[in-house]
Amino acid sequence: MLDVGMTELLCFAIIAILVLGPEKLPEAARFAGRWYVRLKRYITNLQNEIDQELRLSEFRKEMQEELNRIEALERKVQQQLDEIQKQQVSESLEVTETAKTTQKPIWKCTPISGHYKVPYLTKVTSLAAQTDISETSPVELKIAV
């Protein structure tokens, strides 16, 4: 941490003995030890906080990447849904257009003149004279077995 070797410590000890003397040296050593422990604890806490912030930063980055992936997937699904809806609308328009453009067959009927016999009618009439169907009697359907 401080890169202090054994020779440097020995030099500090000799200088401390010369400056402080043998009576005040133990008290100064305790004072220096307390400050050393406080400094070491502070540095350790600072390192832990930095590591925690880095982990949180990495976690936030991973969360943002996942959110970006989810948003991209959501956009893709929305595009597919829009395409399907457009396709359904175009198909329904095609169906209505083909229904409008498809011509119904024209039934051309020409009256037949003369007398004819229609089965299940009670009287003989001419087609040109027959305009109302209410003149016919009810028809019974018989199935041959």
Swiss-Prot record:
Subunit structure: The Tat system comprises two distinct complexes: a TatABC complex, containing multiple copies of TatA, TatB and TatC subunits, and a separate TatA complex, containing only TatA subunits. Substrates initially bind to the TatABC complex, which probably triggers association of the separate TatA complex to form the active translocon.
Domain of life: Bacteria
Keywords: Cell inner membrane, Cell membrane, Membrane, Protein transport, Translocation, Transmembrane, Transmembrane helix, Transport
Name by which UniProt lists this protein: Sec-independent protein translocase protein TatB
An example Gene Ontology molecular-function term: protein transmembrane transporter activity
Classification lineage: Bacteria, Pseudomonadati, Pseudomonadota, Gammaproteobacteria, Moraxellales
Presence of keyword Transmembrane: yes
Gene this protein is translated from: tatB
Protein's job: Part of the twin-arginine translocation (Tat) system that transports large folded proteins containing a characteristic twin-arginine motif in their signal peptide across membranes. Together with TatC, TatB is part of a receptor directly interacting with Tat signal peptides. TatB may form an oligomeric binding site that transiently accommodates folded Tat precursor proteins before their translocation.
One BP annotation, GO: protein transport by the Tat complex
Localization, UniProt: Cell inner membrane
Protein family: Belongs to the TatB family.
Presence of keyword Cytoplasm: no
InterPro entries per UniProt: TatA/B/E, TatB
Recorded topology in the membrane: Single-pass membrane protein
GO terms for cellular component: TAT protein transport complex
Transmembrane segments: 1-21
